[in-house]
């Protein structure tokens, strides 16, 4: 077992409880079960999609258009600090998990990337951000407030054109959030860039305990890459297109079976959790 898998096994381990305690646990879980049913409604999915796809985490929310990748995705890992072999494997597993969900290949490359993921030290984050993201106010805010960070640019058609992710391996591991950073930032640069406390259960909710994509996250990714939606759509156009996409996903079982399907080839399964 690798060091990271061993750490995860300890972090997420459970223990056997007497039957009485399980009954109490089930009662305590009943609100969560109701929430699980609630998130599968068209209304909840629509509003959740608007929260994460049509808003921006650090400003720039006016006249937002929907963005996603239309060109082939080429991901490069700059692995300058930490357990490089393990980190490379984590990125490979998570990127291919996302590729399977969105139905678009994500190639791991050494040149001409359009997504660059930088594994570095916290002390070097600002330097990397200045070189790869510029000195926009939103970048400075992310450096000040965030644990890890990502940004993206779009072309004139509002398609995703380039993205950069910076993860401070030392700091994120110390906080027990390394996997959270890899999972959330890679998922966000697929076209779901905003965090929201209104979206639950989800990795996009900073108050959630979820380190890995949930069934709700799976559906949001499926919506983002459904043919009914196109890069460049306005908010009103997205709202008009979502019922078509939701109907198709419901017919295919992608909503009712989301909690099971999100685990296929997932990082969570790779980690043995």
Where are these regions (language model features)?
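N-terminal signal peptide c-region/cleavage motif recognized by signal peptidases
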Residues: 30-35
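Bacterial N-terminal signal peptides that target proteins for export
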Residues: 4-23
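Charged, glycine-rich intrinsically disordered N-terminal tails and low-complexity linkers that flank
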Residues: 24-29
